[in-house]
Amino acid sequence: MNKTCARCQKVVYPIEELKCLDKTWHKTCFKCTECGMTLNMKTYKGYNKMPYCEAHIPKAKATAIADTPELKRIAENTKIQSNVKYHADFEKAKGKFTQVADDPETLRIKQNTKHISNVAYHGDLEKKAAMEKQRGSAEVSDSSNESEYFSEQLAAEQFSQYAPTASPIPPAATTLHQQQQQLQHQQQQQYQQHQQQLQQQQHQHQHYLQQQQQTLPPPPIQHQQYNTAAITPTYQQLQQQQQQQQQQRAQQQQLHDPYAHYQQPQALRQQQQQQQQQQQQLLQQQAIKQASHLYPTATSQQQQMPPPQSPANPQQQALNSYNEMRSAILQNSHHPSGNSVDQYDQPQQQQHQPQQQSTNPTLVAAQQQQSHHSLLNNNASNGGISHSHHSNINNNGHGSQNQMLPPQMRRSAASVVAYDGNSKQQVAAGPGAAQNHLQQLYASPNYAAVTPSENSINVKQHASNGHMPNQQQQHVAGGSNIGKIADYDPLTDGPRVVPNAGRSSTTLVYSSEPRGNQGGNSVYPKRIGSVSDIDPANGIYGSLTAAEQAHQQQKHQQYYQQVQMMQQQEHPPQQQQMRQQPSYSSLQEKQSRQSTAMRVYRAIYDYEAQDVDEVSFREGDVIFEVESIDSGWMTGRVERTGKTGMLPANYVEQAVI
């Protein structure tokens, strides 16, 4: 079938056929619709599937419309996405500069250029130049003279090694040498002044110590030693002060004259070093003398120790006891191991021993043990016992024997022996009872734990005409051997009981002990079972034994019988005959209802109802008529609101009534 031309409607043969704009044309018929100019495939413009030339093609005219935010957004997106702006900038930049990829070298040059331009812009170079000009010209001239002299002096020293004659010192060198001598003279004066100040301080300190020795009674040598050690500077502190002074002098010399070391001849430098060494040796000898004077040796301590004087009056006695306690505290504070020996305790113990041996020979051992105990526990943190109890004497002349006992014995004696203030007679349960009580106290290897507060309590028992029985004193003296850790043998002694364990700190959940061993310790009537025995409706989450269940059933039956008797008394006998007896099943139902009615629970958490058939309650609410309906759920009536519904079993616990 032959095709027809879109313009002339004639047959188009293949030789002159032209296909364009979805139509078939003769080559001569393919012309502009407006002007009739012949077109080809390169010059035509199509509009409405008709050919037009460039000049006559219909063009869209701009129409004024309202500018809305949506149109603005679209125009902005179009501008960003199109390449029109990029091409326009590219065309403008042609011939002006060339774009180059950034590399590290280019970036470094760019950064340096930026710094240079900033410095030039802010005028930092001019500011630095002005500051340099404002500095003193004298310093600049001095530095130049020093540099010139430094170079000349080095050359002269090198030449003097080979030539016998010495080069004359230039005038600048003479002035510098004079300045150096002046500095040395000033430093020597400062050093002498410092030495004089140190001597004055030492003299004042010695004068102060002499005044103290004249006014106060002679304290122990160790006490004086520790006090002076805290006041006077030690040998190490003197060495540190000397080193600091030498460093300061060296820094001053370097600041005033940095080239002084090279300007001095070698002989002069050696003399200065020898002088410094001699001064250091003198200072060390002085410090050693002071230390030996302030810290005497053991032999000098023994020579200087005054003999113990017997107290003449009560005031001197109290003062001596105070000094003894103070020296013992200081001694134990410097000897933390507790192996020190109290100097002033031994003569007093020797004075007390013959008196007590004449009255009661068995009490001497207790007194010796007490003195050893007081030496070991003399610090304030251990609840120490003051030594002043040696001077406490009652009316009969006997020492207060209860105070010479260890703290445990003192408390036991205080609990057994009592004194009546009115009759002033000793009231006790008898020597046998006291002895039994003390035997119970010291029978077990574990003593009662003694806290520092209990140990520091001074139990004073004064009697005008009485003292402790001899049997009790003998037992106290014999049973005061406190055990050590080394004496404990775990194989033979067995486990020890923890002292002062009033109650166990943990709650027993599962135990292998039988029911009878627990006794009255168990609060709830339950036995220890496994996790599978847990019943949420059982209240205390533990299965009851068969005997307890039978006991509860018996109680329920008795309660049911009582209710039935009351009902029979209320109703006439005719109605009782007409009424049928309840069956066994109905009796069981009533019994179960009564058991649930008797079961009372208390809420341990707040709960909000999540469904219609649930009930809300608050912590502490009482819940009655509880029945277990499912695993973890039960029904009950809240007493506060009166509502009945389902509630979670783990939110409540059985109330103990």
From Swiss-Prot:
- LIM zinc-binding domain ranges (all copies): 3-63
Q: Which GO terms describe its cellular component?
A: A band; cytosol; focal adhesion; sperm individualization complex; Z disc
Checking Gene3D superfamilies in the record gives: Cysteine Rich Protein, SH3 Domains
Cite the residue spans of the region called Disordered.
Answer: 130-151, 164-223, 235-257, 294-318, 332-415, 460-528, 548-592
GO terms for MF: actin binding; actin filament binding; metal ion binding
* Biased composition, class Polar residues, residue ranges: 140-150, 332-341, 358-370, 460-475
Q: Which residues carry this modification: Phosphoserine?
A: 505, 530
Keywords, A to Z? LIM domain, Metal-binding, Phosphoprotein, Repeat, SH3 domain, Zinc
Bias-annotated ranges (Low complexity): 172-215, 236-254, 342-357, 371-403, 549-586
Q: Where are the Nebulin repeats?
A: 64-95, 96-130
Q: Name one GO biological process term.
A: muscle thin filament assembly
Q: Which residues form the SH3 domain?
A: 596-657
Q: What is this protein's name?
A: LIM and SH3 domain protein Lasp
Keyword Zinc in annotation: yes
Among CDD domains, the record links this protein to:
LIM_LASP, SH3_Nebulin_family_C
The record ties this protein, via PANTHER family, to:
LASP, LIM AND SH3 DOMAIN PROTEIN LASP
- Source organism of the structure: Drosophila melanogaster (Fruit fly)
List the Pfam families hit by this protein, alphabetically: LIM, Nebulin, SH3_1
Is Ribosomal protein a UniProt keyword of this protein? no
On assembly, the entry states: Interacts with osk.
